[in-house]
Regions:
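Bacterial N-terminal signal peptides
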Residues: 15-27
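N-terminal pre-domain segments of enzymes
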Residues: 31-76
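N-terminal cap/lid segment of alpha/beta-hydrolase-fold proteins
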Residues: 85-131
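Short beta-strand element of the alpha/beta-hydrolase
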Residues: 134-144
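Cap/lid segment of the alpha/beta-hydrolase catalytic domain
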Residues: 143-227
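Primarily recognizes the serine-hydrolase "nucleophile elbow" in alpha/beta-hydrolase
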Residues: 234-289
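The feature captures the conserved acid-bearing segment of alpha/beta-hydrolase catalytic domains
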Residues: 280-366
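C-terminal catalytic histidine-bearing segment of alpha/beta-hydrolase fold enzymes
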Residues: 348-351, 358-402
Length: 402
């Protein structure tokens, strides 16, 4: 009898354990975005009003309009950064924490100055120790709004894998993030510096508050975010003998940067913006996706609700997000793969991308030059570049595999 009771209690305990596990799993599922139908308001959404070109010529005119809105004199493809060549490997214990120093043959520190504002950003141009067929190629990496300290969230393993495969790697940070500490600009005619007393998202919001009209011409503020990348590409093309293609991998705000720089600089052949943006009309339907000033700036990204259904469907700014996406993949031999984490813990999650992905892919394909596609990563629940994306998307695409 005692054995029966003991056995009964053991069985009851196992049953309760299973029951509690199932309840816990149900609770987890309840708070996760579900792979079900789109929200009712988004079903049958037509994104075509957010694209204002249907020929290559019209698309290139839109690209030129965007470039001239930011740089009135055109893209600064001849401007070089100042350079400290072959710096000490101690940088891997400081600004390049998370990267494997044993994979680097040389590191040059680049200082990009945005003129005439005396605003500076650092970048690190890393030459690989191993020489392969990739050693004429460059990949730019950006971590977005990362914390100070070592690179992480998959950016570190991406950099190390690329160096191991023989690529040159350009490590970059956004303004007022990571190793970029310059917090002042000198405006033309001003008697004193304009200061930003915050970093990260708050600092970026200050930049837009203090550097938009009437202080500077509209669009000029984006130079502080994008021009360093252009100078980095300029340096690569000047320095590396028989320089090859340039690619861009960015996470979060770095994904935002990847969309933007690929739209204006066609020298970026392949871009992988990871968890970087959604069109404005989708942000209310994806938790945490509102974004900071550079994500939402109305003169650029404005969308209007022309039919009164509460969901914008018409582009009204300089370039809509969908136009920027398309321009990032348009051009001979060019491609953009937008990576969105389905269960992202930060932003740009769920399946709302389905409202535009087929339309945009077909548009770029039908225009006849370039490619645009999307990859929904369901392998994790974090805000990161996953091992799956690195091994199944980035490396195969860079290797010419489909």
């Amino acid at each position: 009898m005692e054995n029966l009771v003991r056995g009964g209690r053991s069985s009851l305990g196992r049953c309760l354990a299973i029951l509690f596990a199932l309840v816990g799993q149900l609770q987890t599922w309840a708070v996760m975005p579900q792979e079900e139908n789109l929200p009712a308001a988004l079903q049958n959404y037509d994104p075509s009003g957010l694209i204002r070109f249907n020929t290559l010529d019209q698309a290139e005119k839109k690209r030129e309009q965007l470039i001239r809105w930011i740089w009135s004199g055109g893209l600064p493809v001849d401007v070089q950064p100042t350079v400290d060549r072959d710096i000490d490997t101690a940088v891997f214990e400081e600004h390049l924490g998370g990267l494997d120093a044993q994979l680097a043959g040389r590191v040059d520190r680049l200082n990009a100055s945005v003129s005439p504002y005396d605003y500076h950003q650092l970048m690190y141009f890393i030459s690989p120790k191993v020489r392969t067929t990739n050693s004429r190629r460059l990949v730019i990496l950006n971590s977005g709004h990362r914390a100070n300290g070592a690179f992480q969230y998959g950016v570190d393993q991406t950099a190390n894998r690329l160096l191991r495969d023989g690529f040159h790697v350009l490590m970059t940070d956004m303004p007022l993030v990571g190793f970029n500490s310059d917090n002042s600009v000198i405006l033309p005619g001003a008697n004193e510096e304009t200061l930003f007393d915050a970093r990260g998202t708050s600092g970026h919001n200050q930049m837009f508050a203090k550097l938009c009209p009437p202080m500077l011409p509209d669009g000029e503020v984006f130079r502080f975010f994008l021009e360093p990348f252009i100078q980095g590409v300029n340096y690569f093309r000047k320095t590396v003998s028989d320089a090859g293609d340039v690619s861009f991998v960015g996470l979060s705000g770095g994904g935002w940067a990847g969309h933007m720089i690929a739209a204006v600089d066609v020298r970026i052949q392949t871009s992988f913006p990871v968890a970087g943006s959604l069109p404005l009309y989708l942000r209310p339907y994806s938790p945490g996706s509102r974004g900071d000033a550079e994500q939402m700036y109305e003169p650029l990204f404005k969308e209007v609700d022309g039919d009164g259904d509460g969901i914008p469907e018409t582009a009204a700014g300089v370039a809509s997000w969908l136009e920027i996406y398309a321009l990032g993949g348009l051009g001979p031999g060019r491609k953009q793969v937008q990576v969105l984490n389905f269960y992202d813990s930060c932003c740009f999650s769920t399946n709302v991308y389905l409202t535009y992905t087929a339309f945009l892919s077909e548009l770029v394909r039908d225009l006849g030059e370039g490619e645009w596609t999307i990859y929904s990563d369901r392998s994790h629940r974090a805000h990161m570049i996953s091992t799956q994306v690195l091994s199944e998307v980035i490396i195969p695409q860079l290797s010419g595999q489909k």
